[in-house]
Structures are given as structure tokens and as C-alpha cells.
């Protein structure tokens, strides 16, 4: 089974990309989703590594957020850059993870990802509202594979 290609349907991926685009219309923040078959690392360490490997730390306001999923491990992590991490309360990432986890446990992976994007978007909108000179600094596509 090709875990990366079969985890989400093409339509589900497009719904995720649409959710990212909608979220980024209201914030200067950047959100990405990355899928990997598996990892032998601790999930938070791997999410941080992938965040940097995808050059998400190059955003002007340090407000990128990565949703990282290791499919075979059935684990995921959310990594926020320094700018957003300094602004949100200490439970924000755990609350977002809990919302996603409930959907994942029900097998609703696309819904869980979209809800994670929406939750992240609300925080980004609050602390990093969209500005007239804002530009999309990172791809909105779901990235896949080992980096």
C-alpha cells in the first residue's frame, strides 16, 4: 500500500489546500501540512526537523505552523514558529491537537486536519492579521515524503 498517496483522496487534499487558502486570507501567518510514511524519531522532534527542512522558519514574522503526520506510526505533531508560539497561551497547541485527535480516532483524517487548520487560523488571525502588502510566503500544497 502506498501510504502517502492513499492516506487522503485527491478531493480531500484539495479541501485541505482550500482550508489553508481560506485561513491565509485573514492572516499573514503560513500553514502547511506534511505527510510522511513513518518516523523513528519522537514526533515533536520530527515535526520540528521537517518544519526547518521545508524552510518554514523563513517567514518574515516567524509565524509559520506545520501540521506533521507520520501515517504508519499513527502520530502527528503541530509545530509553530517562534513568533506564534510566543503569542498563544501554553495550552493552545494541546487543545488544537486534542480537536484533531478526536477526528483522527474516528477515521476522519481530512476533517481532523481541516479543524486543526481552522484552530490555528484563529490564533494567527488574532496575533498576525492579514496586511495589505501580505504575500504568500510558502506553498499551500500538502507536502509528502521524507525530507
Report each predicted region and the residues it spans.
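A structural boundary signal for the start of the first folded domain, especially the loop/turn
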Residues: 1-64, 69-147
Amino acid at each position: 500500500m502506498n501510504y502517502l498517496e492513499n492516506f487522503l483522496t485527491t478531493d480531500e487534499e484539495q479541501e485541505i489546500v482550500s482550508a489553508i487558502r481560506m485561513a491565509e486570507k485573514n492572516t499573514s501567518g503560513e500553514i502547511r501540512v506534511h505527510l510522511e510514511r513513518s518516523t523513528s524519531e519522537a514526533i515533536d522532534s520530527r515535526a520540528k526537523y521537517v518544519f526547518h527542512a521545508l524552510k518554514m522558519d523563513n517567514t518574515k514574522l516567524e509565524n509559520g505552523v506545520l501540521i506533521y503526520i507520520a501515517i504508519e506510526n499513527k502520530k502527528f505533531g503541530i509545530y509553530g514558529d517562534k513568533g506564534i508560539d510566543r503569542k498563544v497561551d501554553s495550552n493552545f497547541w494541546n487543545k488544537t491537537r486534542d480537536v484533531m485527535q478526536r477526528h483522527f480516532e474516528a477515521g476522519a483524517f481530512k476533517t481532523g486536519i481541516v479543524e486543526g487548520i481552522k484552530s490555528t487560523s484563529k490564533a494567527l488571525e488574532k496575533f498576525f492579521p492579514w496586511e495589505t502588502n501580505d504575500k504568500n510566503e510558502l506553498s499551500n500544497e500538502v507536502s509528502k515524503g521524507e525530507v
